[in-house]
């Protein structure tokens, strides 16, 4: 492909459009063929070693007859040195000329690329409008990309989406076309909401309108980072979470990101890891607390079970049947209650344990308890008086271990 200064191609595009407009007022296409040639002459006159006079002329001709030849001619001559000329294209050359058009596909693509790089969108639009309706030309990738650029700058977003969704483009054009796709959707979303989009808003737009496969290689991205880039960063982070500025620059070149993006990725990753470690520490502490509580409960259980077994053994060793056992428990409870009352009202008097025992023995014998109850009463009469604290604790333990059948009415003993 020939490389020329941008200003020469501006003139080329303008002259081509003028020639096409002029040709439309002339008689229609002639069977003898339409030949067109674009000649670019560059004459360099070197008058001295310190001054150069450059004269450039651009000629475009469109006429009927003269064969089917056409091409772009670049002639260059120099008076001070050797002369040379470069001729591109020709009537009988290998390039196929478009019907009723003097330029080849390569030349049209070159004009489109130059006008895009120069940012001259208006001239590019006029040049595209002047192209003939030929499938080989209209489906050229450079022409399609130029149409997409013109549609974006004119606000014709539906036409832009149609071009990008229905035509496949090479990977070298994906980045530019992806930017057009996203910017167009951003502009539409901003007009709909009436305010500029932030980072979150743009992320939602990208999720709502994913890139078409015609301009995307299908590789998933995360926060605008491709999986390959993230994999490189993760591998480096596993070895060194704190890369130096030089290492960050190397990573940026390897991943295709900027140094700022690489630095921010490492900062965010370190912050997430610290938060995860803090959360794990809190969970471990709660687990240890619950384990210690369980151990304390387990250490208390044997003593409680031993106490319960001792109470059961005392109940089993008491003589008599079930009624006798219940009466013995009644007698013990009455003794402790009486001792507690005697200490509260008459601390200077001894416990009336003998009277309480006699009353309990009489009541139990009237109920048919037998001699077992009398023996228990006699044993209780011989017991020394108990202190208030010991009596209360013993009463509490006996009441807790007493079955429901052993409950009695304390109103019967109010006279005591």
From Swiss-Prot:
Region (Disordered): 32-91, 262-329
Entries under InterPro entries matching the protein: HD (IPR001356), Homeobox_CS (IPR017970), Homeodomain-like_sf (IPR009057), KN_HD (IPR008422), SIX1_SD (IPR031701)
UniProt keyword list: Developmental protein, DNA-binding, Homeobox, Nucleus
Residue ranges of the annotated DNA-binding region, renumbered to this chain: 218-277
Expressing tissues: In developing embryos, expressed in the eye disk epithelium, bolwig's organ and the optic lobe primordium at areas of invagination. In adults, present in photoreceptor cells in the apical regions of the retina, and in optic lobes.
Keyword set includes DNA-binding: yes
Biased composition regions of type Gly residues, renumbered to the chain: 79-91
Biased composition (Low complexity): 42-57, 291-329
GO molecular function: DNA-binding transcription factor activity, RNA polymerase II-specific; RNA polymerase II cis-regulatory region sequence-specific DNA binding; sequence-specific DNA binding; transcription coactivator binding; transcription corepressor binding
GO cellular component, as recorded: nucleus; transcription regulator complex
Compartment(s) where it occurs, according to its Swiss-Prot or TrEMBL record: Nucleus
Skewed-composition ranges (Basic and acidic residues): 273-290
Keyword Transport among UniProt keywords: no
Effect of gene knockout: Flies specifically display visual defects. These range from reduced ocelli and ommatidia number in weak loss-of-function phenotypes to complete absence of compound eyes and bolwig's organ in more severe lethal phenotypes.
GO biological process, one term: regulation of transcription by RNA polymerase II
Role according to the record: Required for visual system development. May transcriptionally regulate genes necessary for optic lobe invagination and Bolwig's nerve formation.
Family (UniProt): Belongs to the SIX/Sine oculis homeobox family.
Full protein name: Protein sine oculis
Source species: Drosophila melanogaster (Fruit fly)
